[in-house]
Amino acid sequence: YKFFKGNVLNEYNEITKNDGTPFKVYSPFWRNAENYYIESVPQKNKSLKKLKKIKNLFKNKVKPEKILPNKNWYKKFEKYWTPSENDAGKLLQNFITKKVKDYGTLRDYPSINGTSRLSPYIRSGQIHVSLIWRKCNEIKPKNIGIKKYVNEIGWREFSHSLINYFPEMLKGNLRKEFDRFPWVKNKEFLNAWKQGMTGYPIVDAGMRQLYETGWMHNRIRMV
């Protein structure tokens, strides 16, 4: 089979050490990946015009009630997001023209709307990281904000690489010494965490933000 870059800049097997083994440290990985990537601009496929019965591909529709949660709490997400490729592009353009120059500083403050908020759109395929990459690289000269933002794309690439090479990390620690870390199994504590009721303000704010908007600020995710 063949790999096609549908979700990343570089496929995981394209970026390796000289001996063919995967990188486990971010900095050398991204230095190699950033220099390796060459953008391939999508081309129109004239053969698609011959597909007269393309509508038949979608005759077996999936009913929304079969895939959506039983609780309708997600309805409020409509206040915060407008899912579409067009709106993802507008969000990116707004970020690049108005926010990215200060991204290096403002991204560290969860109370400030200083990030791109593009992660839901990237995750659902409404915008591709290659487009984000191109738009960022069109800005001359590059300021610290652009560099920091592109670096975050690098972390996403690195995560995809690690998961492909080490799928066991989805259910365990990549570094086995962390397996000895004490784990408290307490349903009451777990529910308090999910509801944003732990008593730790920064944790609770993040969980409530997630429940309200379906999104959590990057810095809070790290907490």
Task: Locate each region found by the language model.
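Short loop/turn and capping residues at structural boundaries
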Residues: 4-7, 132, 164, 221
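Short clusters of hydrophobic/aromatic residues that line enzyme substrate/ligand-binding pockets
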Residues: 15-16, 26, 103, 183, ...
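C-terminal substrate/ligand-recognition segments
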Residues: 160, 165, 189-223
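Conserved aromatic-histidine-acidic binding/catalytic patches
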Residues: 10, 14, 21, 80, ...
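Generic recognition of short, well-ordered alpha-helical interface segments
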Residues: 21-24, 87, 131, 201
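Trp/Phe/Arg-rich N-terminal binding region typifying the photolyase-homology
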Residues: 1-46, 145, 208
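Alpha-helical cores of eukaryotic small-GTPase signaling modules
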Residues: 170-198
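Glycine/tryptophan-enriched, flexible segments
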Residues: 28-177
